[in-house]
């Protein structure tokens, strides 16, 4: 009986995928590709874009921060969606 109960608990945890954390890209313009695991409860990745005297700048990470023009932002909700 205990074995059955333990088996049901393990199957429930695996099926519910408890503790899932979103993975987002977090590299900046022209840097090697890197990722980060977002904090618990964070379910969004972002990419921001803006121009400066060197050209287009890009920043990526977890969350969906507010930005002001001329910065543009794209937010998404799946692993590695912000590349």
Curated annotation (Swiss-Prot):
Keywords tagged on the record: Disulfide bond, Secreted, Signal, Toxin
MF GO annotations: toxin activity
CDD domains registered for this protein in UniProt: TFP_snake_toxin
Disulfide bonds: 24-45, 38-62, 64-75, 76-81
NAD as UniProt keyword: no
UniProt keyword annotation of Secreted present: yes
GO CC entries: extracellular region
Subcellular location: Secreted
Gene3D superfamilies in the cross-refs: CD59
Tissue expression notes: Expressed by the venom gland.
Signal peptide: 1-21
Pfam families: Toxin_cobra-type (PF21947)
Family named by the database record: Belongs to the three-finger toxin family. Short-chain subfamily. Type I alpha-neurotoxin sub-subfamily.
Name recorded for this polypeptide: Weak toxin DE-1
UniProt source species: Ophiophagus hannah
């Amino acid at each position: 009986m205990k074995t059955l109960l333990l088996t049901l608990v393990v199957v429930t945890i695996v099926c519910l995928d408890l503790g899932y954390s979103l993975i987002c890209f977090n590299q900046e313009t022209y840097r090697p590709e890197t990722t980060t695991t977002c904090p618990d409860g964070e379910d969004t990745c972002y990419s921001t874009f803006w121009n400066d005297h060197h050209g287009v700048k890009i920043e990526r990470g977890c969350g969906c921060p507010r930005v002001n023009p001329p910065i543009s932002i794209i937010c998404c909700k799946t692993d590695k969606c912000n590349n």
